[in-house]
Amino acid sequence: AYPELAAQLESWRKGEVSEDVFSDDEMLAADAPKATRSCGGVVLNRIFAHMPNLFGGSADLGPSNNTELKTSGYFAPDCREGCNIHFGVRELAMACIANGVALYGGLRAYCATFFVFSDYVKPALRLSALMKLPVTYVLTHDSIGVGEDGPTHQPIEQLASLRATPNTYVFRPADQKETAYAYRAALKLNAPSVMALSRQNLPQLEDTCDKAMLGGYILREPKGTPDVILMASGSEVELMYKAADILSVPVSYTHLRAHET
């Protein structure tokens, strides 16, 4: 009776992704410094415009994580069509629910919290990896700097731990474009993905491009054979550019002792 809806449901059950996601330039556009968690909010909502089977939420941190789907309501007994979920402050249960949604099929699940709280999520995330579930974990407030909440909210060892988890893809974008390409790459995976997104504003970089989907690429080609190769991700890419500018300036030390006084 409803062939178009039946075809759409079958496509969702197969885990197919709308090609429109990969040609939507709105998710790439930004002309001012912006935290990549804010960039992620733009990207999620653009994806939802093409994939209404996107389904997820945050552990009571939606406005901070920027993970609310603006054009949908919250899933509830009187709002079965809602694609946002109020998970509450229970990170492990949230991740387990996301796994269940992914296992059922048809819906593309994501969940979110602060990066530092990913330790609560880890057992369920590891099961996502073992079961090859395409759950997206949006982990925000990633930064080497201490924010207004102090060191209790400063992720340090969490990044290394998640990168060491087998069959888990960790994306740490540097700006709007890289955030969009990270989400696009994640949508092609049959495995969990982690979006490590910054707390603070970051500049929009000229050289970032779709090569971000490869995992790593050269941002600035050297004029000759390089003596040093600088590598960075996320919020440190901006600092890497500044370091490269400093290191590329020739300095003559005619009298070293003079610089020590």
What are these regions (language model features)?
Residues 226-253:
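Long hydrophobic segments that form regular secondary structure
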Residues 46, 218-223:
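Short boundary motifs at domain starts and secondary-structure transition points
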Residues 202-219:
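Aromatic-enriched
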Residues 2-196, 201:
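Thiamine diphosphate
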